[in-house]
Regions:
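Catalytic alpha-helical scaffold of carbohydrate-active enzymes acting on polysaccharides/glycoconjugates
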Residues: 2-230
Length: 230
């Protein structure tokens, strides 16, 4: 009886530790969805797409322009050599997407990234860190930046765009897409999804954000998100 009691207590203790670990890494937001998907029957796949959504921040941790430009130079000098050595099934080499932060605007950096884009090695899209923001301010920031990317740097030239439209894709710099952090930090815009759509955003690549508490329960999926104002 004592032996069984000890085993039971060890099992309970182990379960408590596992649950604590799951909650500490915010896995409880998405683990159920993941386990349900694991039970699904595998489907045959013939084509694999690899999407790289790089939160590209040459000024991360520094305000030194020379340091940022040294980081840029490494990409400009080495990425075409590395990517150019590899081809996919249709003969195309890897193309890296630089999601560039609005608040780090540097025309020289973006000119260099635009050159990589013209050579077929890259693309540039929109990335933003903000806090305590408003829908009006966010809208102005997005429209101003996308216009600059196209008119000043020749970027965001997308096939199928309607006249006057500047389509773009987006990553939220602090993962708090649509003001999703429980403490309300690093965004502030409850209707951010609507603002993104109305300013030309065609897809958001913020997720996955685990182990952040901004991670949604829906994982490993391509889907239409639905926001709720307020």
């Amino acid at each position: 009886v004592i032996y069984l009691y000890v085993l039971l207590m060890c099992g309970v203790l182990g379960l408590v530790v596992v649950i604590a670990g799951i909650r500490a890494r915010n896995m409880h937001y998405w683990l159920g969805n993941y386990l349900r998907r694991r039970r699904a029957q595998p489907q045959p796949k013939t084509i694999v797409y690899v999407a790289v959504a790089d939160h590209y921040e040459p000024y991360e941790g520094t305000k030194d322009r020379q340091a940022a430009h040294r980081r840029l130079k490494r990409w400009v000098d080495t990425y075409p050599v590395i990517a150019g050595a590899h081809r996919d099934s249709v003969g195309r080499h890897p193309c890296h997407t630089f999601f560039y932060p609005i608040e780090e605007y540097d025309p020289d950096v973006l000119d260099a990234l635009a050159d990589l884009t013209r050579r077929g090695f890259g693309d540039v899209d929109v990335h933003f860190h903000h806090d305590n923001d408003t829908a009006e301010s966010l809208r102005a920031s997005l429209l101003g930046f996308t216009r600059t990317l196209r008119e000043r740097h020749g970027l965001l030239q997308r096939e199928g765009a309607t006249p006057g439209e500047i389509p773009y894709t987006f990553v939220h710099g602090n993962w708090a897409l649509d003001n999703s952090r429980p403490d309300g930090r690093w965004c502030g815009v409850d209707n951010e999804l609507r603002v993104l759509v109305e300013t030309g955003c065609k897809a958001d690549f913020t997720m996955p954000s685990a182990p952040s508490d901004t991670q949604t329960s829906k994982i490993n999926s391509i889907y239409f998100a639905r926001g709720q104002d307020g």
